[in-house]
Amino acid sequence: MFAKSVILVEGDAEEILIPIMVKQTLGVSLDELGISIINIRSTGFENLAQLFHNQRIKKKCAIITDLDTSITGQKTEASKRGKTRKEKLDALKKRNKWIGVFYAPYTFEIDFLKANNKDEVLSTIKDVYVDKTAIQKSEKDINSKDIKKYGKRILTMANYIGKGWYAILLSNYITPTTCIPNYILDAILFVKPEYSEELLLQIFSYVVSRYEQSDKIKSLNKNILKCKKGELPLTDLIKELYEKLEK
């Protein structure tokens, strides 16, 4: 609670993987961003979120939860609960400026995979299964473009060994090129809307270092040094990066 802002989650997977994804992709930790992540488990978002208020704790609080939309397109008990949960949390958000709510359309596992993270998930298959047939079937399902197939498969794998254990397995394959799902990025930007130029430059330098094998990106190193010395505005450096990546 002593962080500058808080993200509330309801699962082990989010608690384990969000800090790792942020560190690997941005080069900074949640602690460096002044963000604490709290797993409420069965406590209920409403109970804890009420602490963040004009008369209580004046800090931004982002709630991350699943809508549990059915991958078959049919209404299920889980999707009904997701709809009810959204109605309650949206009402809570409307009457409290300190709270933001961000939804995974399906579940964390499915939306992580949908965010262009197929390679990371494929890498976990041989850690989950030893049977050759099961491995081949799983690879085929994950490579499918049909959400009913790849969605069911990743949930099957996660439930097979437990979602917490699966998150730990998956964490071994998170790299700087892993994509953070948009709803998680939105939650981070809600609780941390402003960044110092020093922190932005640190993130920028880390991101550029991921492309160090590219000649067109290597040329940015000189201007990064200029920016650190105050000889070049950070906005000019960012503009130059976008121009080079678009070529």
Where are the model-predicted features located?
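Acidic, divalent-metal-binding catalytic cores of TOPRIM
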Residues: 1-247
